[in-house]
């Protein structure tokens, strides 16, 4: 909040920063697609990332969007290859002439996880994603990209 004062979310720390429509957010927003509103009748995005990926593409194609921040979670019970479809979505955004977008993420997982963190990193980096060492690092970089 020191870098970007008005960040809205469907799960904000401050209730006055609740986003009006999480499927069609405006301004600087962080949307948690694992929140109850998105998982009623569907699997969590760690298991089925299709809603998150579709929303990421939709939002990244908007002309006012410059930075997309996300995380990838690995481990037992998670999607078998979460970065494969995600990398394709990001390549499609860049192919649509949106080269001026920054995609940043962190990976929560290990090389020993069934999805192999090294493999996930390679897939994302090959799509043009800046893969950070932690979610706090990714958020810090995203904030600095937005204000420059």
Q: What is the role of each PLM region?
A:
Residues 1-78, 102-104, 108-132, 138-148:
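ATP-dependent carboxylate/acyl-activation modules
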Residues 94-102:
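A short helix->loop->beta-strand "cap" motif at the edges of active sites that frequently abuts
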Residues 55, 90-91:
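Short glycine-rich, acidic/polar surface loops and turns
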Residues 82-89:
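Charged helix-capping and loop-helix junction motifs
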């Amino acid at each position: 909040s020191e870098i970007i004062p008005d960040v809205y979310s469907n799960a904000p720390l401050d209730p006055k920063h609740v986003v009006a429509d999480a499927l069609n957010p405006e301004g600087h927003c962080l949307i948690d697609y694992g929140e109850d509103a998105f998982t009623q009748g569907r699997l969590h995005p760690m298991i089925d990332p299709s809603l998150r990926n579709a929303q990421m593409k939709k939002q990244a194609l908007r002309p006012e969007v410059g930075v997309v921040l996300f995380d990838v979670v690995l481990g037992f019970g998670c999607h078998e290859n979460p970065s494969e479809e995600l990398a394709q979505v990001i390549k499609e955004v860049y192919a649509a002439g949106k080269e001026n977008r920054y995609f940043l993420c962190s990976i929560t997982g290990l090389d020993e996880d069934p999805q192999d963190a090294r493999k996930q990193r390679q897939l994302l980096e090959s799509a043009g994603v800046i893969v950070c060492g932690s979610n706090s690092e990714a958020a810090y970089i995203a904030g600095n990209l937005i204000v420059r």
